[in-house]
Amino acid sequence: MADTKYTMIGMTSAGKTCYITAMYMKMSAGFDGFTLVTDDRTRTKLERDILTLREPKGQDRFPTATDETTTRSYEFRLSYETKKIITFEMLDYAGGLLRSRENTYEQVKESIAESTALYIFVDGKSFCTDDREQREENVCYDPAMRLTPILQ
């Protein structure tokens, strides 16, 4: 069991799975003496996603998003020069779960309450306009409308 838990929420395609993949890609090789390790099953999945993420262009370069009705759990151990610092679990709630409103909100609220940190992801496409008012509307519409009820 992990020492601590982090919860990630955001709409579909906001980049939660890409974030986990990129974090693991950077930290599994080591960075300033720090390394990140995980179990074999998770490592195999993340290594496959890393190869996908390293594709040069196009939509195919992104890892497959978490299934619309799934919550994916990743458990990691952070070490410094082979000495364990902390183990942590990262919960990746599929963006589609936030649209369903069935039992999801209570599950996500419970996860947030048990977490040390909450990561909120907003799709970069929401910022891809020169019109400031449009950007604000894009960010407020889907993410805020879906996330605000769970955060209250």
Question: Where in this protein do the model-derived segments appear?
Answer:
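Conserved G1/Walker A P-loop phosphate-binding module
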Residues: M1-E68, R72-S73, S79-F88
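Conserved GTPase G-domain substructure that encodes guanine base recognition and part of the catalytic core
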Residues: D3-M8, S13, I20-V37, S115, ...
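Switch II of P-loop NTPase G domains
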Residues: T64-Y119, K125-E136, A144
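Charged/polar, solvent-exposed surface patches and flexible loops
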Residues: T52, E110, M145, P149
